[in-house]
Swiss-Prot record:
The gene is leuD. The keyword Cytoplasm does not apply. It comes from Symbiobacterium thermophilum (strain DSM 24528 / JCM 14929 / IAM 14863 / T). It comes from the Bacteria. It catalyses: (2R,3S)-3-isopropylmalate = (2S)-2-isopropylmalate. This is 3-isopropylmalate dehydratase small subunit.
Length: 203
């Protein structure tokens, strides 16, 4: 998993509340077996018109937000089903962090498992970021080492994050990576473990 320490990039405002996972990545695109390739389908029903052409009214299709890496969203982002494809699609599109007043619990947890940083800020702070992000070229910094969201024009807000999750993100550790930190200890245990102890049979 790619570590996250500090991200400075274009910020795009998605001023909608209760965005659910079916809106993030519609169910008809969930048949892939890889984690990559979902970015092209992100917010599909909003990004594209019925004839398949880009919807010029949707924020991600505006040229000023091309290459954005930080998404600013409304409260309860990621509600609905627990599909892990939602953070996959956001990451594959290029987002590294999402800022919102609140997130659905399962989506929030899935983000950390996939190297995507969800940042909870007060509603008034998110509203101010939405306003600032209307300006072309608006860039924002999300600093996980200092737990700060800031820009070059005086905006600065601290955010809270669980210490264990912060450690995992800073060092790019998923569940397998965490286990491999103890590879030597596991090998030493297996070497000294008596052969007569019961084992789980392989199938």
């Amino acid at each position: 998993m790619r570590p996250f320490t500090r991200e400075t990039g274009l910020a795009v405002p998605l001023d909608r509340v209760n965005v659910d996972t079916d809106q993030i990545i519609p169910k008809q695109f969930l048949k892939r077996i890889e984690r990559t390739g979902f970015g092209q389908f992100l917010f599909h029903d909003w990004r594209y018109l019925p004839d398949g052409s880009p919807n010029p009214e949707f924020v991600l299709n505006r040229p000023q937000y091309a290459g954005a890496t930080i998404l600013i969203a409304g409260r309860n982002f990621g509600s609905g089903s627990s599909r892990e494809h939602a953070p996959w699609a956001l990451s594959d599109y290029g987002f590294r962090a999402i800022i919102a007043p609140s997130f659905a619990d399962i989506f929030y947890n899935n983000c950390f498992q996939n190297g995507l940083l969800p940042v909870v800020l007060p509603e008034e702070a998110v509203a101010e970021l939405m306003r600032r992000a209307q300006e072309p070229g608006y860039r924002l910094t999300v600093d996980l080492e200092r737990c700060v969201v800031e820009d070059d024009a005086g905006f600065r807000v601290d955010f809270a994050i669980d210490a264990f999750r912060r450690h995992r993100m800073l060092h790019g550790l998923d569940d397998i990576g965490l286990t491999l930190q103890y590879e030597d200890e596991i090998a030493a245990y297996e070497a000294r473990r008596p052969a007569w102890l019961p084992t789980t049979p392989a199938r």
